[in-house]
């Protein structure tokens, strides 16, 4: 019987398979940041252990960093302690660190792919739930907890049960203006925020393979938001072209040999999935979340749903609670509500193509007077590229704030956050209660939709812009 892409990568990494036990997988890459690593390094220190494979471990600072200054004190004492501790730990254990002053610093899931650290067929872990991003390369990538971070640091392995498999196929081509973010939000709207629980998802279909690597990263980034353990997309020529020539990618004949192997990383024709979900790309419109989980999402031209429209009593109760928290009225349009803040950034949408998409909307226009709009590139490399293209000038002339790289307003762990009841159009991945600040109201959208909301002062359908 044939194997799925996930099964091929999983099986290739089984180091120990004792009877009656979950297999132990070898881990090819371990990405580390300042928030989930301090206790893991403490554990090594207490037990007198070293980092097993320093050459496969890469650290950066992203969650706590200020986006207005490189001053390590700017985000408060706890942030300073976490960043200083990461510096100390990386120096002591010999781990490569891209700190806040390094030219490669950035959000861990932006930094890894752009440097060629992320490669097809690998197992990749990080103490961060959105590690699934790297699955866009056909790698098995997933988030782990701090005790598991310690285990990988010490052994370069991890005990990991085999997951069920789900195929999500997006058939046909999307309409003009529809982005990867719209595709993945539409998928989560279809599956719900728990529909992928217990599964590793493979995304496929023409609408997926048409995406650039950056678009594919956006899709896989949000696999966790439908409850999945990880999300993968089979590598192809788009993947190989992206990887070629990057800092840590194979070079010359090694690259050619790697590509030959990478070409085998696809689901066999006769392979069986445990579940299959199908969407028609032509049906996907610009998406906006209305509730407090990413599955509570509608097309921008749809009315806000009424709780009684949900047959499931749990979903109905969830909708009632979400509408109350979000300050929304069923039946109205989301465009009836002003936004207070706009955030273009996060590991979902802070790469150069995201910057370009937002700049295209911003060019020659002005941010509404009541809106604060932040553009936060995902890394120093993205920032430099955007500035070389003059995108920062476009944003600043339009009234957007051009910031330094970091996780920023995706989560309220630094100075970029919402005040109580402030409404935000955000390109991030989570719209949970309080995610962007206490009592903050988050609506997830694409970079183009976010930029358009900043200018109009409320949500608009980008298909209707001049």
Curated annotation (Swiss-Prot):
Biological process according to GO: L-leucine biosynthetic process
Catalytic activity: (2R,3S)-3-isopropylmalate = (2S)-2-isopropylmalate
Listed pathway(s): Amino-acid biosynthesis; L-leucine biosynthesis; L-leucine from 3-methyl-2-oxobutanoate: step 2/4
Domain of life: Bacteria
Keyword terms: 4Fe-4S, Amino-acid biosynthesis, Branched-chain amino acid biosynthesis, Iron, Iron-sulfur, Leucine biosynthesis, Lyase, Metal-binding
EC numbers on record: 4.2.1.33
Record bears the keyword Manganese: no
GO molecular function per UniProt: 3-isopropylmalate dehydratase activity; 4 iron, 4 sulfur cluster binding; metal ion binding
Cofactor note: Binds 1 [4Fe-4S] cluster per subunit.
Requisite cofactors: [4Fe-4S] cluster
Binding residues for [4Fe-4S] cluster: 347, 407, 410
Keyword Iron: yes
Top enzyme class: lyase
Coiled-coil region: none
Function: Catalyzes the isomerization between 2-isopropylmalate and 3-isopropylmalate, via the formation of 2-isopropylmaleate.
Family (UniProt): Belongs to the aconitase/IPM isomerase family. LeuC type 1 subfamily.
PANTHER family: 3-ISOPROPYLMALATE DEHYDRATASE, HOMOACONITASE, MITOCHONDRIAL-RELATED
HAMAP family: LeuC_type1
Complex and partners: Heterodimer of LeuC and LeuD.
Protein name stated in the entry: 3-isopropylmalate dehydratase large subunit
Organism per entry: Vibrio campbellii (strain ATCC BAA-1116)
Gene that produces this protein: leuC
